[in-house]
Amino acid sequence: MNKETVLILGARSDIAMSTAHFFAKAGYDLQLAARNINTLDQYKSNFEQKYQINVTLHEFDALKINSHKYFANSLPELPNIIVCAVGCMGEQKKNEQDIELASNIIRSNFEGPASIFSIFANLFEQRGSGTLVGISSVAGERGRAKNYIYGSSKAGFTVFLSGLRNRLAMRGVHVVTVLPGFVATKMTDNIQLPKKITAQPDHVGKAIFNAVKKKTNIVY
């Protein structure tokens, strides 16, 4: 039984939960983190009973930057793998007219994830091991009128992950960039997605698990 631990940030998302299942099935213990951990109680029980692993729940808010260092230090143990599934899409038209909404999108997709990963990157570097998995998006590959605020925030996170990977490459720390396209999740419920090229959360979760095991740098 593999007793390594995986921390999943933004654990309430569909992709995060699917990813958790793949690691749990392989025997990894889980640390599930989200803003409202009460909604994770049922998942904790399910994982523990189904996979015979240890699961702990932790309150985490990506936008509360000042709390990130405390969060990292308060975990029962430093995880071996961290998956960041934090993110927010919003509506482009509303984001264009409301700077506070736009700021929330940018902070949720870039500033918050980059902040918490910076803290754990230093801890992993000191230990000499670990894997950081950041879920970005192909929307960050090119600016488009219909989603450039969301896309630009993801572009920033993609570049951050690339630089972090280069920095830590010789330090025993692996950084994975995940770039999903269309995925049928709660976040895309209000969007009409092209069925032929739309993935399911399980496809992404499996790809993340395989990337960690095979030490793949970039996953589409």
Question: Which residues make up each language-model segment?
Answer:
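Conserved glycine-rich cofactor-binding loop
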Residues: 12-14
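Conserved glycine-rich Rossmann-like NAD(P)H-binding loop of the short-chain dehydrogenase/reductase
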Residues: 26-42
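Rossmann-fold cofactor-recognition segment
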Residues: 49-66
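Conserved mid-core segment of classical short-chain dehydrogenase/reductases
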Residues: 87-103, 146
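Active-site helix of classical SDR
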Residues: 117, 153
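Residue(s) in the substrate-gating loop at a strand-loop-helix junction
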Residues: 137
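C-terminal helical subdomain
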Residues: 177, 193-220
